[in-house]
């Protein structure tokens, strides 16, 4: 066990092999001794991984680009909170470079395959985190989610992907992809585990300009809740996905839900703005200095995505923002008639071969039902729904207004446990469902304390601070 005040020992190593014996490329950096600061706290005994765009003090943050890599001198806020809650960090995971992708193949550290069938993509950009959870290598993992990066790989690997309301978890110490819509996401085998992690990490952070003090909805959904589904769902010709979604709709009906067909036109157009308008300039802005100096160190098609961000004027950005605002207003008309949205997490699976043949088109398909969520300020939860006849997982995403995180979790757990699925790719049965307590955000005000003696991390009285919500900064 390594105390956070020591320099962590790390290695660059592979994860376990796939069923074909090929490496899974899920890890970029391993911490062989683990990193733990206390044996007390609500997450004591649990292990986790962090996507390699999230800072861990003394360990390189590569964002899957060696030329960009740096060694931070402090933990990201979310990592610090997890360590203070007793969790043990085992390493940092692979991702689509600069978190630009939804497929898990855009990394010089190797493509991460699907945990069920290595011929298929894992989904991304939180590919390594999803694989590590699905394979049972960690108890949970951190990802990020700008356009679906925490949901798509969850849906494709039979695990839970919790995309919280924007600003609910601090993004301080996270290398941004598009700062105004970035979220830290949680990947876990069960909804209860994901919520347990969320409880340990949520709360306003005055040092993060995009952190927010949110009023979280704690009233359960009605017994006969209304769930919106796309009036004309798109599966890109994947009949197995279409059948799996219909099965999931029946599963929600069995939980008391009433399906309501929803016009997705404003959501679909909003999704297109993320890459097909001047909003893509925010991705370029996130790495502008590096990209202007070393664009040749960025792999394709990430390089082309970032390059596209250089072509717009400030007027173009405003025009895109105005259009997004108009679409957000149109989308508001959906909510009086429903309590929650339900969509396929991904409309189809894609082979590694097909992704390499046409990486832009295939990636765009995977984001069909995810790209609009952060732009419209929604919360989302991807939960496993079934295993298709071809052996590949299918997941659905429950979407609600900002602050509906607990409501989504409560419904998501009921739905997930009714499926009879196992945990990820491990074959282990789901543990018994347990009540999910209403989420209580940390208060925004805090008292700064200098701590000495037995209250330091790893010492006997540190638990007294942790029990009162203290966070080491």
Model-derived features: positions:
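Short, well-ordered alpha-helical
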Residues: 1-71, 75-76, 98-101, 218, ...
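A short helix-breaking turn/cap at a secondary-structure junction
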Residues: 29-34, 163-246, 266, 410-440
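Short helix-loop capping/hinge segments that flank enzyme active sites or metal/cofactor-binding pockets
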Residues: 43-65, 223-224, 278-332, 384-392
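Gly/Ser-rich, acidic/histidine-flanked active-site/gating loops
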Residues: 48, 54-57, 68, 81, ...
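Short Gly/aromatic-enriched secondary-structure transition segments
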Residues: 62-69, 461-473
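Short glycine/serine-rich loop segments
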Residues: 75-76, 80-201, 374-397
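Glycine-rich, small-residue loops and helix-cap segments
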Residues: 84, 201, 312-445, 455-456
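Acyltransferase
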Residues: 239-263, 287-293, 317-338
């Amino acid at each position: 066990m390594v105390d956070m005040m020591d320099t962590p020992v790390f290695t660059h190593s592979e994860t376990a092999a796939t069923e074909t014996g090929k490496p899974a490329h899920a890890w970029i950096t391993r911490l062989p001794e683990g990193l733990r600061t206390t044996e007390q706290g609500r997450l004591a005994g649990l292990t986790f991984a962090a996507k390699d765009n999230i800072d861990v003090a003394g360990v390189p943050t590569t964002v899957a680009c060696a030329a960009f890599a740096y060694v931070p001198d402090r933990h990201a806020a979310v990592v610090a909170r997890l360590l203070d809650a007793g969790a043990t960090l085992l390493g940092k995971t692979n991702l689509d470079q600069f978190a630009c992708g939804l497929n898990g193949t855009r990394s010089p550290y190797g493509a991460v395959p699907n945990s069920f069938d290595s011929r298929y993509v894992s989904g991304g950009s939180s590919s390594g985190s999803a694989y590590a959870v699905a394979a049972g290598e960690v108890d949970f993992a951190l990802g990020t989610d700008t356009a679906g990066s925490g949901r798509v790989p969850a849906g494709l690997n039979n695990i839970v992907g919790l995309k919280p309301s924007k600003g609910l978890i601090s993004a301080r110490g996270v290398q941004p992809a598009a700062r105004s819509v970035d979220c830290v996401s949680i990947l876990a085998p069960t909804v209860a585990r994901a919520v347990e992690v969320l409880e340990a990490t949520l709360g306003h952070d005055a040092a993060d300009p995009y952190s927010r003090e949110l009023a979280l909805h704690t009233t359960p959904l009605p017994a006969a809740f209304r769930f919106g589904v796309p009036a004309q769902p798109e599966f890109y010709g994947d009949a197995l996905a279409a059948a799996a979604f219909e099965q999931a709709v029946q599963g929600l009906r069995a939980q008391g839900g009433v399906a309501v067909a929803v016009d997705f036109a404003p959501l679909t157009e909003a999704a297109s703005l993320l890459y097909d308008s001047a909003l893509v300039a925010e991705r370029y802005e996130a790495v502008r200095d590096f990209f202007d100096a070393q664009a040749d160190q960025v792999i394709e098609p990430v390089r082309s995505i970032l390059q596209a961000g250089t072509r717009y004027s400030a007027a173009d950005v405003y025009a895109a923002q105005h259009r997004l605002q108009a679409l957000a207003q149109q989308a508001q008309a959906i909510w009086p008639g429903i309590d929650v949205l339900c969509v396929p997490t991904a409309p189809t699976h894609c082979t590694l071969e097909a992704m390499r043949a046409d990486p832009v088109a295939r990636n765009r398909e995977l984001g069909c039902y995810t790209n609009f969520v952060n732009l419209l300020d929604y919360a989302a939860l991807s939960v496993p729904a079934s295993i298709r006849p071809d052996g590949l997982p299918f997941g659905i995403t429950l979407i609600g207004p900002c602050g509906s995180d607990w409501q989504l979790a409560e419904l998501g757990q009921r739905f997930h446990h009714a499926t009879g699925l196992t945990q990820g790719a491990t074959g282990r049965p789901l543990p018994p469902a347990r009540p999910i307590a209403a989420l209580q955000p940390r208060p925004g005000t805090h008292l700064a304390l200098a701590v000495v003696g037995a209250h330091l991390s790893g010492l006997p009285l540190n638990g007294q601070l942790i029990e009162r919500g203290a966070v080491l900064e």
